């Protein structure tokens, strides 16, 4: 009996692997285990009831279609938690004909909480785990990284407000209001926190109607709705069938006026209805280029918080966590050296540790300070003696612009561009805060943020400027 259902499920999984994305398959299909097939009913076991509720809500039709496609005798699919599997298998090997009992939630209505009860099964097939009816809301949820949870997020002074706000909005607390906007550079935790909110809701409030998309996905879905004359369905999905909306990378909507108008309408409707909204971008609303004024105003109406690069204490904890995850053993001096010298984003820290692990394995598994210094020098290239004033002096010499001019209010391109490059390099290669870098040039922190964004964008579009910035980066590493 087990071999038959296992074979059918394996074939069905092969079909699902072809029809679903790799992430969706690995996160939501692969964990399901086939445990029984009898009288046309296949029983699949999932990790817990929240997982099962999400699978039933989003992928039940695909699962049923794939199973009936490989075995026409299959007429129904039922689910149970994996913790009930040993009991089921034990029961199946007994000679007793007495009907087994399984705990199932008692459901009085969709609006009342379920309570555990013990019910006798009328047949040898365990009753399907029942939950309060999950609304069929056509949820849009990006594939979630399994480790991007609140428990795995390393909290420090640079991100504590953003983390607290995300916990509050996921718990539907009134402390942050209905709309939360998070901005930061790449690799500092925006996506991690957004995934964490989604994970929390799936685990604790599986009936919450949640849509989690990137701004580009929202735009593509809107265009599809326009082309297929289905905008009514699109509007209903996001304005009516939604309790919380998560949208990443708002800055990618630059110049997309129609999408901005549509998303602004969605935000307005949701906020007025008391629903929750979480937006992320690489800059604060007022600093986003190519964004409509009304849309900018709507995004600015709630709590706005930024995530800065982690401080040395947080970096030390990140090093310890990432090293443990790769089964590497660092002593206190090694951890301290990495935390002091790898000053970029979390991805940069992880990259350095991965490189250390790879080189150690190639060299027989031995890790010492010489190896760590070599990796930091080649992969990261940071120098703890660097300061924004040293970089300012280097830029002054390279562009033949006086320090006084770099600190002046002049907007001449011959002065403003070197100043912006200097701020960009200071942010990249030093541990100084935005305010400290700003003081070096007699500016405030917002000017530094703007300069970093300008150089990042220009260097990506202008190959000549990109090469110049890379050359200057090499010179900074040699200071």
Curated annotation (Swiss-Prot):
InterPro entries in the cross-refs: AAA+_ATPase, Chromosome_initiator_DnaA, Chromosome_initiator_DnaA-like, DnaA_C, DnaA_dom, DnaA_N_dom, DnaA_N_sf, P-loop_NTPase
Domain I, interacts with DnaA modulators as annotated region, ranges: 1-74
Cellular localization per UniProt: Cytoplasm
Region (Domain III, AAA+ region): 143-360
Residues covered by region (Domain II): 74-142
Statement: the UniProt record of this protein carries the keyword Zinc: no
Pfam family, one: Bac_DnaA
Record GO biological process: DNA replication initiation; regulation of DNA replication
Annotated GO MF terms: ATP binding; ATP hydrolysis activity; DNA replication origin binding; lipid binding
Highest rank taxon of the organism: Bacteria
Gene Ontology terms: cellular component: cytoplasm; plasma membrane
Residues binding ATP, per UniProt: 187, 189-191
Keyword Secreted appears in the UniProt entry: no
Principal location listed in the UniProt entry: cytoplasm
Keywords: ATP-binding, Cytoplasm, DNA replication, DNA-binding, Lipid-binding, Nucleotide-binding
Family the UniProt entry places it in: Belongs to the DnaA family.
Functional note: Plays an essential role in the initiation and regulation of chromosomal replication. ATP-DnaA binds to the origin of replication (oriC) to initiate formation of the DNA replication initiation complex once per cell cycle. Binds the DnaA box (a 9 base pair repeat at the origin) and separates the double-stranded (ds)DNA. Forms a right-handed helical filament on oriC DNA; dsDNA binds to the exterior of the filament while single-stranded (ss)DNA is stabiized in the filament's interior.
Summary of subunit composition and partner proteins: Oligomerizes as a right-handed, spiral filament on DNA at oriC.
Domain notes: Domain I is involved in oligomerization and binding regulators, domain II is flexibile and of varying length in different bacteria, domain III forms the AAA+ region, while domain IV binds dsDNA.
Protein name: Chromosomal replication initiator protein DnaA
Record organism: Desulfotalea psychrophila (strain LSv54 / DSM 12343)
This protein's encoding gene: dnaA
């Amino acid at each position: 009996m087990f071999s038959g259902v296992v074979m059918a499920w394996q074939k069905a999984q092969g079909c699902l692997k072809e029809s679903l994305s790799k992430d969706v398959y690995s996160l939501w299909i692969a964990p399901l285990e086939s445990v029984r097939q009898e009288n046309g009913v296949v029983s699949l076991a999932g990790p817990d009831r929240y997982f099962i509720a999400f699978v039933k809500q989003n992928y039940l039709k695909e699962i049923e279609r794939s199973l009936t496609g490989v075995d026409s005798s299959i007429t129904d699919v039922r689910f149970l938690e994996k913790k009930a599997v040993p009991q089921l298998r034990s029961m199946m090997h007994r000679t007793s004909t007495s009907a087994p009992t399984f705990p199932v939630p008692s459901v009085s209505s969709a609006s009342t909480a379920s309570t555990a009860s013990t019910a006798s099964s009328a047949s040898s097939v365990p009753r399907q785990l029942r939950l309060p009816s999950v609304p069929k809301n056509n949820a849009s949820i990006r594939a979630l990284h399994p480790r991007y949870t609140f428990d795995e997020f390393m909290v420090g002074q640079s991100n504590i407000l953003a983390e607290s706000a995300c916990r509050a909005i996921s718990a539907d607390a009134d402390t942050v209001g209905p709309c939360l906007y998070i901005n930061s550079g790449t690799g500092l935790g925006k996506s991690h926190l957004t995934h964490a909110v989604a994970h929390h809701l799936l685990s604790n409030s599986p009936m919450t109607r949640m849509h989690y998309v990137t701004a580009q996905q929202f735009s593509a879905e809107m265009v599809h709705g326009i082309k297929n004359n289905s905008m009514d369905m699109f509007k209903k999905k996001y304005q009516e069938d939604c309790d919380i909306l998560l949208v990443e990378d708002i800055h990618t909507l630059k110049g997309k006026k129609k999408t901005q108008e549509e998303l602004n309408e969605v935000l307005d409707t949701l906020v007025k209805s008391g629903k929750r909204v979480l937006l992320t971008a690489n800059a604060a609303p007022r600093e986003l280029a190519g964004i409509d004024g009304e849309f900018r105003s709507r995004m600015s109406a709630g709590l706005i918080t930024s995530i800065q690069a982690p401080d040395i204490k947080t970096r030390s904890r990140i090093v310890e966590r990432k090293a443990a995850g790769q089964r590497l053993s660092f002593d206190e001096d090694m951890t301290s050296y990495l935390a002091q010298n790898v000053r970029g984003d979390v991805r940069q820290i992880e990259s350095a540790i991965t490189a250390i692990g790879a080189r150690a394995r190639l060299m027989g598994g031995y890790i010492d300070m010489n190896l760590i210094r070599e990796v930091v020098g080649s992969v990261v290239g940071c120098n703890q003696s660097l300061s924004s004033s040293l970089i300012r002096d280097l830029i002054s010499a390279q562009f033949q612009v006086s320090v006084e001019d770099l600190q002046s209010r002049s907007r001449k391109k011959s002065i403003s561009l070197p100043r912006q490059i200097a701020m960009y390099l200071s942010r990249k290669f030093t541990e100084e805060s935005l305010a400290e870098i700003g003081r070096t040039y007699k500016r405030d922190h917002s000017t530094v943020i703007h300069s970093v964004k300008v150089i990042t964008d220009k260097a990506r579009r202008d190959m000549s400027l990109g090469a110049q910035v890379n050359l200057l980066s090499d010179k900074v590493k040699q200071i």
